[in-house]
Amino acid sequence: MAQANFGVVGMAVMGKNLALNVESRGYTVAIYNRTTSKTEEVYKEHQDKNLVLTKTLEEFVGSLEKPRRIMLMVQAGAATDATIKSLLPLLDKGDILIDGGNTHFPDTMRRNAELADSGINFIGTGVSGGEKGALLGPSMMPGGQKEAYDLVAPIFEQIAAKAPQDGKPCVAYMGANGAGHYVKMVHNGIEYGDMQLIAESYDLLKRVLGLSNAEIQAIFEEWNEGELDSYLIEITKEVLKRKDDEGEGYIVDKILDKAGNKGTGKWTSESALDLGVPLPLITESVFARYISTYKDERVKASKVLSGPAVNFSGDKKEVIEKIRKALYFSKIMSYAQGFAQLRKASEEFDWDLPYGTIAQIWRAGCIIRAEFLQNITDAFDKDSELENLLLDDYFVDITKRYQEAVRDVVSLAVQAGIPIPTFTSAISYYDSYRSENLPANLIQAQRDYFGAHTYERTDKAGIFHYDWYTED
């Protein structure tokens, strides 16, 4: 049997496509699936490729050159643990296991520590781009032992997407243990925010301005030529022009307004809460999906709860431009929050995350790829210790020029009774972050009153408690 250079466990669409991607770069790839018929199906479909068909884990491991490089593309959670448990007795010290699933970062940290005791290297790798990206080039976020990553880097750099701006591969070492999967988690949280902001923009254009799908599609097409140039804007304009293949009209109008999720947005918000990082926009985008699932209750509520009538009579062209500015402004708030979370996590877990590089490897292959990511890289190149993107000169200038549009759009939506939780959250975050003084002094006084939680003073150092129960 030919010695394979790389192995992939899991022949669902992502695993199959990654295996084919690696093979297309000149490598021989061993493939294995728990259900042998699936492995045979993939092998038969691609007999002209340098794939090694294996029917048992023993055969799979035996087919690989040492140190073995094995990528797990199985369901996150218990299935990954079970696969590792089955593989472990067959591996030698120095072998490398790569988890390319949508894994929660604490699981990656645990597995990394457990496998290190056995001398097995473990690389948790976030993979973004979906099934097409897996085949043609994803964005990849690996974390684990640096020396182990160096052994897989040549393959990863070949299979990763290449940024159109400079041809650089969209993969880089993120840091120790769970760093890669953490970065992918935040990527997914930002993705939630981007999608909700676009949805709210669409809703305003449709329900407030009364525009047709064709008109909205043309607007998104124009927006994709400027600052908002991104994959999600690109696919939105494609979605809006597609007709229903089972009837009349547009397919988007026939899709039930209940948004699903796989939990990664929730993970991002949970981690932010654990770290004490404000992440309001991304968290609102998660809640927006949740409330969308309450369809039956919303239908009932729509019949009994009153709201204002939508009666717009202004300049539509002017409002469209304000919505564009509000969308870009709010997108900046989302990324500022996400990168602030990455900074706090990096400090907490001692990862030394490369913030500018993270923005670079998101420029192609992934769902949130966007032109403005270069502005983020530039910001961190100028100041690697930048506390928040909003403090960078470029973003200071944009927010100064665009904030009025956001305030107008939020006011318009509120007066029309149109929910825009992420737009509203964006301007509130901005105003909170730029406020030298917030009313938290009153909250701290209340906490001290009922729970003797103490407080600090503005005029002198120390921790204080006031005797609230003594008459003044």
From Swiss-Prot:
Catalytic activity: 6-phospho-D-gluconate + NADP(+) = D-ribulose 5-phosphate + CO2 + NADPH
Pfam families linked to this entry: 6PGD, NAD_binding_2
Binding site for NADP(+): 10-15, 33-35, 74-76, 102
Residue numbers annotated as active site: 184, 191
Keyword Oxidoreductase: yes
Gene Ontology terms for molecular function: NADP binding; phosphogluconate dehydrogenase (decarboxylating) activity
Gene3D superfamilies: 6-Phosphogluconate Dehydrogenase, domain 3, N-(1-d-carboxylethyl)-l-norvaline Dehydrogenase, domain 2, NAD(P)-binding Rossmann-like Domain
Entry's Gene Ontology BP terms: D-gluconate metabolic process; organic acid catabolic process; pentose-phosphate shunt
InterPro entries: 6-PGluconate_DH-like_C_sf, 6PGD_dom2, 6PGDH_C, 6PGDH_Gnd/GntZ, 6PGDH_NADP-bd, 6PGdom_BS, NAD(P)-bd_dom_sf, Pgluconate_DH
Pathway: Carbohydrate degradation; pentose phosphate pathway; D-ribulose 5-phosphate from D-glucose 6-phosphate (oxidative stage): step 3/3
UniProt xrefs under SMART domains: 6PGD (SM01350)
Function: Catalyzes the oxidative decarboxylation of 6-phosphogluconate to ribulose 5-phosphate and CO(2), with concomitant reduction of NADP to NADPH.
Family matches, as NCBIfam families: gnd, PRK09287.1
Protein name, entry field: 6-phosphogluconate dehydrogenase, decarboxylating
Gene source species: Lactococcus lactis subsp. lactis (strain IL1403) (Streptococcus lactis)
